[in-house]
Amino acid sequence: MKNLLLLFCLFLNMASSCQSDGDKNNGEQTNGLEKVTYAVSNEVFTNPERGFMHTWQVNSEGAAITAASLNNLKKENVSLILRLYYLEKFKTTPLSQTQLDLIKTDFTRLREAGLKCVLRFAYTDAQDGSDASVAVISGHLDQLKPILEENKDVIAFVQAGFVGAWGEWYYTTNQLTTPANKKLILDKLLESFPKEVKIQVRTPKIKQDFVATTTAMDATVGYGTSNTARLGFHNDCFMASVDDYGTYTNVTADKTYISNEALYVPTGGETCPPANVPIASCSIAETEMTLLKWTYLNLDYYGPVLQEWRNNNCFTDFERKLGYRLSVSSSSIKKEVALNGSLEFNALINNSGFAPVYNPKNAFLILRATTGGTIYKKKLNFDVRKVVPKVTFDLKESVSLSGVPAGTYELLLKIEDSSSKLADRPDYCVRLANTGIWEATTGFNKLSQTVIIK
């Protein structure tokens, strides 16, 4: 009989140890807290203001972007476009109402499609073409200012533009690249674009001359809204020569400078035909984009470089890594909280992308009633911009549950756009790169945690 009892107990023990609910997110008790760990996802998906992008350029008074074209981008996991306006008809005159209406229509369609743009204006696409005077540029920016303010929610970043061929601050016919004129134009750009919008200049020297220092800013400046904190970089000959066709003056020093600055301001652009260097391999591209913290890259140019990455199986990896890619490794809470008390919420957040988030977001802990589904949003102090690549961010918050009735609630994390126009749009919410936690209909990330308020 004793032998039978021992065998029965052994069977129960084995059965218990083999049980599994099949969930990849596992819970455990630690120091009285319920800890859940999460599986990282390898899926390619979109997130706002980052990734590979398509370029759409349009001449003066041309056709607006079609809704169908924008909606098709979602099939490519693209959330960002470069919208380049050539103002060749207006080198000596104000912008027409037709031109202004074109820009307004584009912004409306971007918003309807759930996308954003990198914005640039230029007067010519030819090296021997002409640009406009400082006075004309200033007048055009005055005309654009109210439109830009109204539509700042769908402007991810702005490339400085206006000067020279393609708006790349070279080949000017109006002496726009003298130190005095560069300062006038940058001052006007910073005044005309909303303070929330970061402006990218073509070379590090342009910014260094403007702010009168070669020392990269620190976090005290970088997370603010000063002019220094608003100037990032775009490179339209990325990895194409030793100095990227004149992008760098002192290559090593300039790259270090951009790497440090890019903790706070965006870098992005496109490749171009290589000169006296081999085409950028997967390993070279990985190294450069990691160092310089690239957040977006043009899909439409330069084709042979992009094909090199496709042929060597790193293109998909770059789809994941361009910009930010946030994931949660674990979260911990106390399962029971007193009515109108505070919930101690801890989470470890990682960023496996090349870059941080650059535009401020609003983060909320969502409590959703397990019975009835009523939702309560609790604002967090969490600044998602501070989750930088390769450094685990330790999120610790005491969340007031004032106003939340007694009951059982599941917990979710929402990171939404700072604009009230977009806050409720899932397309503009940050999706975490974890398995099985994204809710596409709400923009919530499920934490597989429940709390009981009593």
Predicted features and spans:
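Active-site groove signature of glycoside hydrolases
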Residues: 118-127, 144-176
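Catalytic-core regions of glycoside hydrolase
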Residues: 157-159, 168, 173-302
